[in-house]
């Protein structure tokens, strides 16, 4: 007899006679909806898309349950206390610049590549995009710069002139696939655990080079935070995993994101606080990229970037306007309000 499992996140039918301790993968916590973000109290995954929220894989393994569980309404505010683990209260008072300076590591390790997590929806979009698409078709050679790299994944050719078009392009027409630590391309069956070996895999198709020029993109981007994680979100259509990378050290972040149409978003910043690089990651979705930075110490950040970083960008005339969505207004001396701007203008007028 087949029974329906009522564990949250499962919903599968099972045979009671073959119900084992690892048969069910479910969420023991409760759903959390906060400022358009949706997730479970028992794990860190957050999304703004409701269908992706429903498809978040369970974080706990156990027995299937045939008894209907009592309904628990979604929690409308910040992270809930899980029945398995008591969470620490959010420290809403940002640390001062002096405290941040004392706590920053004295010696910096070189930035490391953060792992890229490709959503199932993006994988489908990339596979649809590759159908009947010949790279490099219709490109005007007069628009190609000498020294431009071929944009096809797996090809490292460099444009030296019209004669470069005569050389074959060996590339991967498919999309990258990352599953349970294994990395491969959808167009060929070679799988590897090492990310460097994955990038070095030779292409499986021969075609034309794609010398398309990458255009700087003015992408909308914002950030939000919880007690333990800071999330920087960059919005754009169809990020291309093969060309994207994000590097981070404990106090610095370097971002290079390529979207469909060869539009590129780049950013470099010193972070307000210290992060745990090993636990941080990047999630790629059809309409955005989320960079999740795990804080080294729980607490609130007054802003995303360190004051020194903002001052340097202001002097260079490239100050990035970041919109912090979740945290409350800070009384920190580093905050600058419109009223203070008006007072300064009046003082200068006198």
UniProtKB/Swiss-Prot annotation:
Domain CHORD stretches: 5-64, 150-209
InterPro entries: CHORD_dom, CHRD1, CS_dom, HSP20-like_chaperone
Biased composition (Polar residues): 80-92
Pfam name, any one: CHORD
Positions of the CS domain: 216-305
Comment on protein domains: The tail domain binds to the cytoplasmic domain of both integrin beta-1a and beta-1d isoforms. The presence of Ca(2+) ions does not prevent binding of a fragment consisting of the second cysteine rich repeat and the tail domain but prevents the binding of the full-length protein.
Described function: May play a role during maturation and/or organization of muscles cells.
UniProt-recorded name of the protein: Integrin beta-1-binding protein 2
């Amino acid at each position: 007899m087949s029974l329906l499992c009522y564990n949250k996140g499962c919903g599968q039918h099972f045979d009671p006679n073959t119900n084992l301790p690892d048969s069910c993968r479910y969420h023991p916590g409760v759903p959390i909806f906060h400022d358009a973000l949706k997730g479970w109290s028992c794990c860190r995954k957050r999304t703004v898309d409701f269908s992706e929220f429903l498809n978040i894989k369970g974080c706990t393994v156990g027995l299937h349950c045939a008894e209907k569980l009592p309904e628990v309404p979604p929690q409308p505010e910040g992270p809930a206390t899980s029945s398995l683990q008591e969470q620490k209260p959010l420290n809403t008072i940002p640390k001062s610049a002096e405290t941040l300076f004392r706590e920053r590591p004295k010696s910096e390790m070189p930035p490391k590549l953060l792992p890229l997590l490709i959503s199932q929806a993006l994988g489908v979009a990339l596979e649809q995009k590759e159908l009947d698409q010949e790279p490099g078709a219709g490109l005007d050679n007069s628009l190609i710069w000498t020294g431009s790299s071929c944009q096809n994944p797996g090809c490292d050719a460099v444009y030296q002139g019209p004669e470069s078009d005569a050389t074959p392009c060996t590339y991967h027409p498919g999309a990258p696939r990352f599953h349970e630590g294994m990395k491969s391309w959808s167009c060929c069956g070679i799988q590897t655990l090492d990310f460097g070996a994955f990038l070095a895999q030779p292409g499986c198709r021969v075609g034309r080079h794609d010398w398309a020029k990458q255009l700087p993109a003015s992408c909308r981007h914002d950030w939000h935070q919880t007690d333990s994680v800071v999330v920087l979100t960059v919005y754009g259509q169809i990020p291309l995993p093969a060309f994207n990378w994000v590097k981070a050290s404990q106090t610095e972040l370097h971002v290079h994101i390529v979207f469909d149409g060869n539009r590129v978003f780049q950013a470099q910043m010193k972070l307000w606080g210290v992060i745990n690089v090993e636990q941080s990651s990047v999630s790629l979705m059809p309409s955005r990229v989320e960079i999740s930075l795990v804080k080294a110490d729980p607490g609130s950040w007054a802003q995303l970037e360190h004051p020194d970083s903002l001052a340097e960008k202001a002097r260079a005339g490239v100050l990035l306007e970041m919109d912090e969505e979740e945290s409350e207004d800070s009384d920190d001396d580093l905050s600058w309000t419109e009223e203070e701007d008006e007072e300064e203008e009046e003082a200068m007028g006198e």
